[in-house]
Amino acid sequence: MCYFCSRLAVNVCFPMKKSLIALAFGTLALGMAEFVMMGILPDIARSLGVSIPEAGHLISAYALGVCFGAPLTVLVARTRPLKHILLALTGLIILGNACAALSPNYWTLLAMRFVSGLPHGAFFGVGAVVAERVADKGRRAEAVSIMVVGMTVANLFGVPLGTYISGAVTWRATFGIVAVWGAVAMLLVKLWVPALPALPDTGMKGQFRFLKSAAPWLVLASVMLGNGGIFCWYSYVSPLMVHTSGFRSEDLTLIVMLAGFGMFAGNIVGGHYADRFTPERVVRFTLGTACLALVGIFFGAHVRYLSLALMCLTTACLFCVSSPQQLLILENSRGGEMLGAALVQVAFNLGNALGAYVGGLPIGHGLGYEYTALPGAAFVLLGMTAAMIYIRKYPRHEQR
């Protein structure tokens, strides 16, 4: 498996366009800013004298920033050259995380987490358009997957590193590293992203015209429900691995890294096969696999290494659908491509929030952590149903 993934990564990524590397650095900074909070939450709570639930609002503030900033930034900046928008967004990454590192109290940090989330969805939206434009013929999904690979590397290495630094030094240093990474991304965007012209201005109303069709709504529903289903389980993967699967707390760092490896491998595989076959087929197959894996987790979570293997498979599915779904929304949002691609991130984050809430319900009723996988499987099945309706309603995409 590792040999297959390594060979596939080589075939996909080399020779790699420098512009895509610049985009990947940006998504790495965003991925670390979003997900490192799960690891440093206790340190922040102790430092600022707040409870864990209050500190948890820092995660919600970031997600709210994503949902608010994605459509707003794209609509305001729709007439600007794409490179200029990316530079402004990386500047916002630097500002939000640098100010978070210097926050004197909880409320300032809460506000800065909101600011840090503002560029997230817009960067993915603009970045997806740039990746599609610079991609070689027949390799559009691979180009988008290279951009997204930064997010997976953040989960594989960035989050464990940030968690370690928070414990060894201070959580402020972790946010400082994210700001520095944002500065590196800004420099690479400045040097390597070509001066692409702005997209044709279809006006404010024209940006929303694509939403009159059912196609983008079906894609967004597939994103929200599919990711929400996986996050029903993944939001509680750490206590599940310790209390149900029988791993030690000391093993969690390695377990999180293995989950990140699954994300990395899934992203590479998804981009490759979306170009080789079609994005629709990859989405359909991957969501079906994720549904079966979650059912397997429910029945097999007490078997230590089976639970670990199913975790890697499910996190691979989480990112295997990412670039195919981005490509599908670009194909179905002509005239509002940046808004469409940004809305994918909104749907992703809404799915995360919904999944974390629904997954917590069986735990709150005294059931075991493995029960989080049951509503997760149901949500993924609904996401796959939305994808199947899309495929049947718009078969021309399967035949292009």
Where are these regions (language model features)?
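Cytoplasmic helix-loop-helix junction between adjacent transmembrane helices
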Residues: 112-150
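Conserved MFS/SLC helix-loop-helix module at the cytosolic interface between two early adjacent transmembrane helices
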Residues: 68-104
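Paired small-residue
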Residues: 96, 107-116, 305-313
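Helix-breaking motifs and short loop linkers at transmembrane-helix boundaries and internal kinks
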Residues: 49, 81, 102-108, 246, ...
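Helix-to-loop junctions at the C-terminal end of transmembrane segments
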Residues: 70-81, 267-278, 363
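C-terminal transmembrane helical hairpin of 12-TM major facilitator-type secondary transporters
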Residues: 281-325
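Helix-loop-helix hairpin linking two adjacent transmembrane segments in secondary transporters
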Residues: 137, 146-191, 236
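A late C-terminal transmembrane helix in Major Facilitator Superfamily
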Residues: 332-367, 376
